[in-house]
Structures are given as C-alpha cells and as structure tokens.
Amino acid sequence: MAVKSGARSGRNVVHLARPTLRETLGRLAPGTPLRDGLERILRGRTGALIVLGYDDSVEAICDGGFVLDVRYAPTRLRELSKMDGAVVLSSDGSRILRANVQLVPDPSIPTDESGTRHRSAERTAIQTGYPVISVSHSMSIVTVYVAGERHVVPDSATILSRANQTIATLERYKGRLDEVSRQLSTAEIEDFVTLRDVMTVVQRLEMVRRISLEIDADVVELGTDGRQLKLQLDELVGDNETARELIVRDYHANPDPPTAAQVAATLEELDSLSDSELLDFTVLARVFGYPSTAEAQDSAMSSRGYRAMAAIPRLQFAHVDLLVRSFGSLQNLLAASADDLQSVDGIGSMWARHIREGLSLLAESTIADRLA
C-alpha cells in the first residue's frame, strides 16, 4: 500500500489509502455487527466516539484510557461507550483495541463542528485518514467522518422513502430510454440516422446511469434492508453500461472504430459533464468528436453495427469487431450475403449463416415494430 505523509501549515495530516465513504457506509448498514452496536448505543441514549482503524497515527493522538484487544461484540461496544472516552477498533472492525481514550488531534485542523465530540471526530478523521463515528446522545444522531466528508446516517425508513421516489424517476427515465433506443434502431435499419437521434440516446443513457448511482448508494447504506431495492435497480438498469459502450463504438467521430482506450476516455468525459451540460446536445456532440453547433445536429450518421449485432444471440464481441472492421457500416453488413460474411477471417460457414439470419430477423422485427 502506497503511503504518503506530509505537513501543511503546521498540520500533521497523514494521507493513506483509507476506506471511502461508500465502503464505510457499507460497514454501518443495517444487518452488520457495527450497526447493531450503534443501534444499542442510540437506544441507551448515550453518546459515543468510535475510531474505525488503528496504527501509529491513531496511537499518536490517544491519551489515557486502557488497552483491551478483545473480539468485537455489539454489547461490548455499547457498554464501553458509556464511558466518556473514545473506543478504537481494528481496521477490519473485528476487535476492540482501546477504550475510554481521550483523542487529541491537531487543534489547527479546521472544523465547522461546534460540539466537542464532533470536533474531535472530524479532526481525527482528517489527521489519521480513518473513519470516525460520532453518536450524539442529545439528538440521537449518528454522524460519520471519512475522507474529508461528513455524513449523517439516517434510519432505514428515511432512506427507503427517498429511494422509492428515486426508483419511480428511474422507471420514467428507463421508459423514455427504451423509446428513443427503438427509434434509433429503426433509423439505423432505414439508414436515416441524424446526430440528434444519437445524442438523444446518449443523453438518456447517461441520465439512467446517474440516477442509478444515487439508488445504488442507498442500497449500500440500507444493507440487508435494501435487498428488494437492489433487485428493482438491477432489473431497471439492465445492461445500460454495455449500451453506453456500444453507442460510442458505433458513432464516435474517429474514422476507424474507436479503440478500447478511446471508448473509455469518451465515457469518462461524459461522466464528468455537469447536469446542465448533459442537457446540451452540442456539448454531447463535442465529446463524440463532432462540431458543437446546432446545425451539426441534423447531420446524417451511419451506424458501424456494434449495437445491432449485439442483439444477435451467442455472437461474441470478437466476431462483431472483425465484421465491423471488414464491412465498415451496418448498411454494408445488412447487404452482405452469408458468403460475404464467411470471407472474413475467423468467420466460419456456421457463424456466417447465423449472423446473416440474425441480421435479417433484426431488420424484419425493427420494421414490424415501427408499423405496429
């Protein structure tokens, strides 16, 4: 594990590869031993200060208390938290190492907290890099400090209420995505695609991705209470990430099919767009390498065929890539015979017939859907 340490403005701040907020919330989720201990503390109307990790940086700010080094148990955490000092757990949370400790972090580390316990928690988290939990006995609130972030841990009912509203929004987004994706598929078969058609699908794919991340964070925080929510999320999102990759492969402005690195860079740039930029098709066009003008939105496009052939059962990506690089576009693939397909190195007669039948069925079903 890479370790970098340094001091800034007189502050002894240690930068280590430490747990993220997401990882920490997973450890605090309902159904986990740590959450059980926190619930017992809340029910007992006592406060607590808990450090989730131990090394020399934690040892350096510990004053007093006593060494335990015993197996973690929710009941033990509850009893030890009755004392005024902090409880220090091992990095994996399996053992209670110290109790009734006075934490003395660097007072020059800035904090917006007002209470003594919360100020110590935030400064300790910043200085050591380990997550620190503060339980307020007066307000019955659990706050976790990690990676420079402050997060109040809500109860499951609050998270579920919020997540159910977000799921309803995701359902609307997914319905619209399915609609514009079908329209694009029809336009591809009829060779009547515009840049606006493509950017509409790109926008909707990204909107689904972003809202699904919000729900996924709730799933992590819910723990065992989020199983049903997780099933709903997985069903709605489906293969959204694959669809994002395929549309980049089909429509990136690069003259040749984009490399894996180019696809990854394009998706990363899409991820970095602000919500307002995501609503602007000219910005999306620029990400794909096209002119960022309103006039360019009516430009004719031609699919390379990655999306279409992904719908053919059992067809491997390696075969799809070979065919796209050989024929250049979906229209050329649709016009190719089984013999033409077989002429590509790596495509045998059986695969050629399978692909030819798959493309024919795809064209027929797409046109039938439009007429229905």
Swiss-Prot record:
Cofactor(s) named in the record: Mg(2+)
Effect listed in the UniProt record for changing H137A: Loss of enzymatic activity
Ligand binding (ATP): G85, L103, T116, R117, H118, R119, S120
Keywords of this entry: ATP-binding, DNA damage, DNA repair, DNA-binding, Magnesium, Manganese, Nucleotide-binding, Nucleotidyltransferase, Transferase
Induction description: Forms part of an operon with radA.
Regulation: Diadenylate cyclase activity is inhibited by the interaction with RadA.
Top-rank EC class of the record's enzyme: transferase
All residue ranges annotated as the DAC domain in the record: 18-156
Keyword Manganese: yes
GO biological process: DNA repair
Enzyme Commission number(s): 2.7.7.85
Catalytic activities: 2 ATP = 3',3'-c-di-AMP + 2 diphosphate
Subunit structure: Homooctamer. Interacts with RadA; this interaction leads to the inhibition of the diadenylate cyclase activity of DisA.
Misc. remarks from the entry: Overexpression of DisA leads to cell expansion, induces cell aggregation, and inhibits bacterial growth and motility; coexpression of RadA rescues these abnormal phenotypes.
HAMAP family according to UniProt: DisA
Free-text function comment from the UniProt entry: Participates in a DNA-damage check-point. DisA forms globular foci that rapidly scan along the chromosomes searching for lesions. Also has diadenylate cyclase activity, catalyzing the condensation of 2 ATP molecules into cyclic di-AMP (c-di-AMP). c-di-AMP likely acts as a signaling molecule that may couple DNA integrity with a cellular process.
Family statement drawn from the similarity comment of this UniProt entry: Belongs to the DisA family.
Record protein name field: DNA integrity scanning protein DisA
Species of the source: Mycolicibacterium smegmatis (strain ATCC 700084 / mc(2)155) (Mycobacterium smegmatis)
Gene behind this protein: disA
